[in-house]
Amino acid sequence: MTIGTAKIFAPEHWGSLEKFSKFYNGTFSLKDSGKRAVSGAISHFRKAITLHNLAIKLVPNLETDEAELDKHGYTSAVNAQELSAIIESIFLELYSSVDCTRKVITEIYSNYQGIPNSTRKYFNRIYEGNFDERFPEQLIIAVREATWYEDFRKMRDELTHLETGSCHKNKDTAKIQYMHTGFTIEGRALVIDDIFEKINQTLNNVNQFIGRVFAYLLTQLKDEPVLQFCGIFH
């Protein structure tokens, strides 16, 4: 059996998080929890993208629910439930990526005052200006630019503990509308008129936050040799 060539070392295709994951051990001696957090930040974001692609593929299945409703006057809405579960998982994975990113920060700056081991508290401390004066400005900016975080956190908290919401295709707009009666805002059930627009917006927000954090952490790496597996060459 002939083994082909497989190039694994390709930094020209890596973002700041992936680059950091390859080279940080020459500078930072992270604990196992920190190492898992670096890996988790990547893995959860990739899972969110995979789930997003799957959700798009499931959209046509909603027509089966509509056909059942038209024929029998009711529908079990199985396909809508499946799509809703995938959609909710996307948001949970994205929050987990943010959470893992914060864990990396917490471990690296564990000796600084006001850097709590909680993502919610971490964001609040930065918003309130209650942190060690030595804390890097770029990491402060990353949080203060993330004005979307608080609403995102509330959504994540609710989705973690509630039953699955529902979705359907709006006949007038052709957009996929998502609704959750258990999640209320000012006494009204959560309704998102275009859930895929919301997903794309959240993907971009999280990607920007993670990118800014690890772009800064990359600048803190020492110019030290790091052993890398480059690939399989035949």
Please identify what each model-predicted range represents.
Residues 1-92, 100-234:
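Acidic, Ser/Thr/Gly/Pro-rich intrinsically disordered interaction regions
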